[in-house]
Structure formats: C-alpha cells, structure tokens
Amino acid sequence: MMTGVDDTATMLTGRVVTPERVLDDGAVLVEGDRISWVGRRADLDDRSAERPDDWAEGRTILPGLVDVHCHGGAGGEFGADPDAGRTAAMHHLRHGTTSLVGSLVSAPAPSLVAGVAACAELVAAGVLAGIHLEGPFLSVARCGAQDPTTLVDPDPSLVDALLTAAHGGLVQMTFAPERSGAAELVDQLATARAIPAVGHTDCDAVVARSALDRVLERGPRAGRPLVTHVFNGMPPLHHRSPGPVAAALGSAARGEAVLEVVGDSEHLAPETVRMLFETVGPDGLALITDAMAASGMPEGRFRLGGREVVVEGRTARLADGGAIAGGVATLIDVVRWCVTEVGVPLHDAVNAASRTPAAVMGWADVGALEPGRRADLLVVDDGYEPVRVLRAGAWVT
C-alpha cells in the first residue's frame, strides 16, 4: 500500500497503461516533475484515495508519447526557422507527444547545416528531444519525396559540420548502406552517439544485414540499430530477392534492430502493420508519424524541404510525381488507428509509441508510467482523443 503522499501531489485515476499491463482501475501519483507511484487504485491509502482529480475518472492515462521521426506540423517545418519549428513542436505536444525528434530532409550542405543549427537551439531549450537527419546519403532510386539532386555519398567533412552544428543534439541519421563510404559513416556517427538508421535504400539483404550488424557492433546510444520507416523507401520483400526488409525483420526478431513504422493508414496496409506486431512485437517497433507541415492543417499545398506537396484527405503527395511525402497524423492518431482499425492491443501500440522509441534512444527518463520517471502523460477519452497533456509535471492542455 502507498503511504506518505505530499499534499501538493496530483493524483489521477482511471484506466492506466503501464509497461507491463493495462490497469482498468488504476492510479498515477505525480509529485513535482516526477511520477512517484503507479498502481491499482485499491492499493491507495485512505488519505490518497480521497484526493484524485475527478475529471480523469473513467478515462485512459497513457505515458507521454515519443516520436523519433517528425518533420513538422501546424504549418511549421523543422529547418532553418526556429519559430516554425516551435510551432510544429507545440502542435505535437498538445496532442500528447511529450518527447519529439525533429527530422530534416536532404538539402544542399549549407541549408542542411543551417537547419541543424536552428534545431539545436530547440534541443537546448527543451522543445525538441533531438535531431534526425533523413539524408543526404540516400539512394536516388529510393529517394521517395527527397530531392534526388541533393543526394550524395557520405562525406566525413560534411558530417563533421553537421555534428558541430548539432551541439550534441543529433540522435539519428538515415543512410543507404550501398553508398560508397557508408561503413565509415556508421563509425563516425556512432562515435558521436548518433544512431545510423538504414533507410531510403536499394541495397540487397546481405548489404543491409552487414550494415545493421556494424551498427550493432559500434553500439551508439542503447546499442540497437534503427530502420527508417520499414517497407517505405526500400524494395518490397520478394521471396527470391528479399532486400533490406528481410534483413530488417530478421534483426528485429532477434531483438537487435528497432523498426520505425508509419501506422497512419496511408503508408502501410493494416495487415502489414498487424504482421509486424505479431512477428516482431512492440519491443522491436517504434511507431512514428513522419509528419510534415500539413499535420493539423486543412487540405491544401505545403512544402517539404523546398518541394511542393499536395494534401488531400489524410494523404500528402509531391505535386510533381505523386510520391508520398510524409504524413499528416499525430502520434496519438497513429496509436488510435493501430488499435481501432488494425486490432493491435492497446498495451502493445502504446509501448511501441513510447517505451520502445525511448529505449532505443537511451532515454531512461521518459517513455513509461513508472515511479522515478519524468511526469509525462496523456489522458485520452474512449475514442483515444486527447483530453489533457502533462509534461514534466506541468499541464500543457
């Protein structure tokens, strides 16, 4: 039984999603900026049981969500304009993403360095949890919405400039392992504690597995490789030419790689997402949004890294060519779709949107409703719509 509750503590009761289970009649105690207790409401002492915040009763309490791949939202894009980045980050925070990595697409070197420097300001201010570079060392054949004219082989001097501009904030970088110099890039990034993530690649299974093994050996952050939005930006799985998907699935099934999954109803079919949860499991999957500036905005025309994007319904596509150009969802939208449309158990979907991405980044302070962790949580209604968001013990909404 829990005892000794501070009179200034916040107590929430409802359905609570912990790392291990869903407590149908649970409680979360927040003291200051920390979670101090999580458990069954029946285990509260008499004094504490009389003090819950009644508005949360009957609702579901989730850990603050963790999105490690997001390009923007609310009309703002992560890049050289820090104000636009703040706008995007606040949009996702209000929808329950309490730890957000800002992603930048490929661009000419000066623009990329400037964008990283601006995002580093947001990391220093606590607005972003880190920076992700999706390029420019990618495959032209699998560039997706990336500008193919900006894609180049790994350049150690450019990487040094980007790392310098990031001031320690670079947490992952997507690369195509078939590019000349890719092995050296893995070593350079790992030394800087940035995770090399395999993606936007046209390589075969052998090359992909070798790259994932090299990242595993170098062990940046928590020691696990990442695969950028698995299935998207790479050859499809074929029984005689398995490609990087086979290597990614095998590595994740062994408990090694973590696979990013854009579960937004547009990037992957429901059966594909269900297969990933059933074969790999939530410990090897990180649900992401891959959201761009159009997230939270009406249909219309937007830009992604300088390229024009047309948004109709839930789909963002390049105006020129029609390639999918990121997503328009928030991470709670992704969780909702996985649970209500795909049939993923709530516990698994939430872990893949919080605990697993936090773990792969080595962030022991966030990602779960556990005593001692930062008090980040999201309260949702029966339709998994956000009701209130708490970050570091302070209500955001």
What are these regions (language model features)?
Residues 71, 86-115, 127-139, 166-178, ...:
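Divalent metal-dependent hydrolysis catalytic cores, especially in the metallo-beta-lactamase
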Residues 240-259, 277-289, 294-380:
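His/Asp/Glu-enriched, well-ordered alpha-helical/loop segment
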Residues 152-259, 266-285, 304-305:
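Histidine/acidic residue-rich metal-binding segments in metalloenzymes
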Residues 74-76, 108-109, 140, 146-149, ...:
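Short, small-residue-enriched loops and turns at beta-alpha junctions
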Residues 71-82, 145-152, 197:
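Active-site mouth loops of central-metabolism enzymes
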Residues 14, 28, 33, 58, ...:
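Divalent metal-coordination and catalytic microenvironments
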Residues 1-47, 394:
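N-terminal metal-binding scaffold of metallo-dependent hydrolase/deaminase domains
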